[in-house]
Structures are given as C-alpha cells and as structure tokens.
Amino acid sequence: MALPNQGTVDYPSFKLVIVGDGGTGKTTFVKRHLTGEFEKKYEPTIGVEVHPLDFTTNCGKIRFYCWDTAGQEKFGGLRDGYYIHGQCAIIMFDVTSRLTYKNVPTWHRDLCRVCENIPIVLCGNKVDVKNRQVKAKQVTFHRKKNLQYYEISAKSNYNFEKPFLYLARKLAGDPNLHFVEAVALKPPEVPIDLAMQQQHEAELAAAAAQPLPDDDDDLIE
C-alpha cells in the first residue's frame, strides 16, 4: 500500500505495520535495511516514516512498505489511520523489559480491531542483551493467538530476515518461497552469543510442547 507521494513499483508490494511499546527497537530494526533507509518517506499527516524494503525471492521481487510510528506510541495509542489497509504486521517487544511483553495483547487487540485476518509476527527483540527479563519459555502469547514468533536482535542483525520471509510466504500463499539474495544491511553494532541463543531456541521448542498456562501472571509480577 503505497502512499500518495510514493511511486508504485511493478512487483507485489504490501503495507506492513510495525507496532509495540516505545523503545522496543522498531525503528532500529527497519533501519538495518540500507535501501529502505535511503528511500524512506515521512508522511506528516499520520506522523509516520514509511520505509520501502525490497527482497528478492525465487518468485521475483517483493516490497514491504514498513510503517514506523516515529515514536508517537509513547503518547498513547495509535490512530486508526496507521492501521488502515495494513496487509501484514509485526508486533515487537523487548526481552529486557517485562512491561513491553505485558502490553503485547493490547497492541494485538488494537491491530486486529482494524486489520482482520492478516498475517502477524511477534518479535522479541534485544536477545543480544545478557540479562533478559522475559525468558524464552515465558513467551506464550503467540501460541494463544496462532502467531509466528521469532527472537531477534536488531543491532546484531540476528534473524533479521525471518519475519519478512514468514510474511512473504503467507502473503504469496507459497510455503516454499525463499529469498535468493542477501539483503544489504548495516554492519552489526553488537555481537550475539550464538550458543546462548541456541539454548533459548531449544527452550522455546521445549515450551511449545507444554500445555499453555491459563494466564501470563507469572511473567508480569
């Protein structure tokens, strides 16, 4: 969904809305993609920056117009104009802040009120930080709502492409779609402990085999 002041492209393009509490790393995440950062447009009427992120797949190019709130979520909820015509979404929280995970259901509710039945990815960002407050096994919201979940680190580029690949497959209706070119990203700013992250991924897999808890109260006390 291009904005009026943006040229359209002759390959599939989709409006991707990115939501979550302020400070969770949404802007850092979209700015990793160098061409999207170069071509971004500011839309003052809604107060968003729109980053066109291109990916090359085995079925041709695909573009996500990533709508970034430019921090306005710190002053309350987002206007419906931000969500309208959204075709896919990323909800982001910060694994070093319990509160940002506690607020995920609110973001999900606001999103689904305007955008029904769109593919959504939940992302736990900042997994490069050692003292995470939200453990991998405590992340259960995606299972309750049938969302895809990825642990990411925007600053180290860890798992950067995974949310986009999942959404591209859903939007194309092709589970075998894959990216055929590496995306030009900014160099990593922080290292990531891959052994530790493999441990977290194993915890996630083990947790997925367990019955869902009745609520998330153990996480937010």
UniProtKB/Swiss-Prot annotation:
What name goes with this protein? GTP-binding nuclear protein Ran-2
Q: What does this protein do?
A: GTP-binding protein involved in nucleocytoplasmic transport. Required for the import of protein into the nucleus and also for RNA export. Involved in chromatin condensation and control of cell cycle.
Task: Give the record's GO CC terms.
Answer: cytoplasm; nucleus
Statement: the UniProt record of this protein carries the keyword Translocase: no
Gene3D superfamilies annotated for this entry? P-loop containing nucleotide triphosphate hydrolases
Record: residues binding GTP:
21-28, 71, 125-128, 153-155
Chief subcellular location equals nucleus
Q: Where is this region: Switch-II?
A: 71-87
Q: Which UniProt keywords apply?
A: GTP-binding, Nucleotide-binding, Nucleus, Protein transport, Transport
What GO MF annotations does this protein's record show?
GTP binding; GTPase activity
**Domain Small GTPase Ran-type spans what residues?**
10-174
State the residue spans of region: Switch-I.
40-48
The entry's localization annotation reads: Nucleus
Listed SMART domains:
RAB, RAN, RAS, RHO
Family according to the record: Belongs to the small GTPase superfamily. Ran family.
Offer one example of a GO biological process linked to this entry: protein import into nucleus
Q: How does it assemble?
A: Found in a nuclear export complex with RanGTP, exportin and pre-miRNA.
Q: Record's InterPro entries? A: P-loop_NTPase, Ran_GTPase, Small_GTP-bd, Small_GTPase
